[in-house]
Curated annotation (Swiss-Prot):
Function: Component of the large ribosomal subunit. The ribosome is a large ribonucleoprotein complex responsible for the synthesis of proteins in the cell.
Assembly description: Component of the large ribosomal subunit.
Modified residues (N6-acetyllysine): 9, 67
PANTHER family per record: 60S RIBOSOMAL PROTEIN L38, LARGE RIBOSOMAL SUBUNIT PROTEIN EL38
Example GO molecular function: structural constituent of ribosome
Name of the protein in question: Large ribosomal subunit protein eL38
GO cellular component: cytosolic large ribosomal subunit
GO biological process: protein-RNA complex assembly; translation
Amino acid sequence: MPRKIEEIKDFLLTARRKDAKSVNIKKNKDNVKFKVRCSRYLYTLVITDKEKAEKLKQSLPPGLAVKELK
């Protein structure tokens, strides 16, 4: 089931959880979507600023599987 996250800080807390398996990054021409798969929900964060998206990509936990989709 999908859930939407509005804040970057909440997304980072969700990505650091023990049940977080992977992160998918979908890039469009006007926004970037970060989707983190946890045991129950797929959490989605939509960012319209490309620079913030790059910073967030660098601050993801190192043990998480990151997959970039075009």
